[in-house]
Amino acid sequence: MTTLTGKTVLLTGASRGLGVYIARALAKEQATVVCVSRSQSGLAQTCNAVKAAGGKAIAIPFDVRNTSQLSALVQQAQDIVGPIDVLINNAGIEINGTFANYSLAEIQSIFNTNLLAAMELTRLLLPSMMERGSGRIVNIASLAGKKGVAFNSVYSASKAGLIMWTDAMRQELVGTGVNISVVCPGYVSQTGMTVDTRVSAPKLAGISTPKSVANAVVKAIKNKTTEVIVNQNPITESLTKLMLAVGQISPTSVDRIYRWFGVVDFNQKRAENRVKDGYVAVESHRS
């Protein structure tokens, strides 16, 4: 799929954060974007942005945490636009905290949004893609899924699951004409975790722009890229890959690097702020 012109894309988490930037990037490629999110007002704004950028947009308000109802979402989308060429699983939720303080409902909410919704949407759309011998699936994960992050353990686990599932599916789909990719951004400016003005994201760890992440998604679709690390610039990305490789040999060495970068302190402060806020869920860069 060297071009997205005339292709139909189903994008979850489209109402804010990264979702808006991804939708705009797709619009510039002349794609039709089926925008899915819980926020009807946010979807309207995203659809307007898509149309302004030269694309076509359809809004479908839906909470992807309701995984048992996702078949209705897929049917509604296909009734409106026909076959889906590209699925982008971007919806995500993040709740910082010490693990002992998580409720089962919070854990289930994170996994339903970050992992199970992606699996179920893929399961529902994959047969038609395989029948046509063409399709793209892009999962938006996180560097937190490549290296566990203290005080964000459930989010890390959900994203690690997304990465490993993508890896397994990539092997399973060889020869089908359907390709699956995973994009792993680090901290992203102007979105989710970085908008808490009470604590600044650790600059030493690298901070990317949402536009750069959106561009990486488009490139992954066009180039069939297996895995994309997005972290500020090519040099920082190369160092990140090296650090992750070292972590496979000596995990505690990278633990110390994370503490030195300020990653652990950052997440601990966000967890403390969550307690002060009365345990309100802090959604990540897409919802």
Swiss-Prot record:
Coiled-coil ranges from the UniProt annotation: none
Asked if Oxidoreductase is a keyword of the record, the answer is yes
The entry marks the following residues as binding substrate, namely S142
> Has keyword Oxidoreductase?
yes
What EC number(s) does its UniProt record assign?
Answer: 1.3.1.-
Q: Where does the chain bind NAD(+)?
A: 11-35
- Cross-referenced PROSITE patterns: ADH_SHORT
Which Pfam families would you find in this protein's record?
adh_short (PF00106)
Q: Which UniProt keywords apply?
A: Heterocyst, Oxidoreductase
Active site, UniProt feature: Y155
**Single biological process term from Gene Ontology:** heterocyst development
Q: Name one GO molecular function term.
A: oxidoreductase activity
Name the enzyme's class: oxidoreductase
Gene3D superfamilies named among the record's database cross-references:
NAD(P)-binding Rossmann-like Domain
Q: Name one GO cellular component term.
A: membrane
Q: Which domain of life is it from?
A: Bacteria
Job of this protein:
May be involved in repressing heterocyst differentiation and may be essential for preventing all vegetative cells from differentiating.
Q: Which family does it belong to?
A: Belongs to the short-chain dehydrogenases/reductases (SDR) family.
UniProt name for this protein: Ketoacyl reductase HetN
The opening ranks of the lineage are: Bacteria, Bacillati, Cyanobacteriota, Cyanophyceae, Nostocales
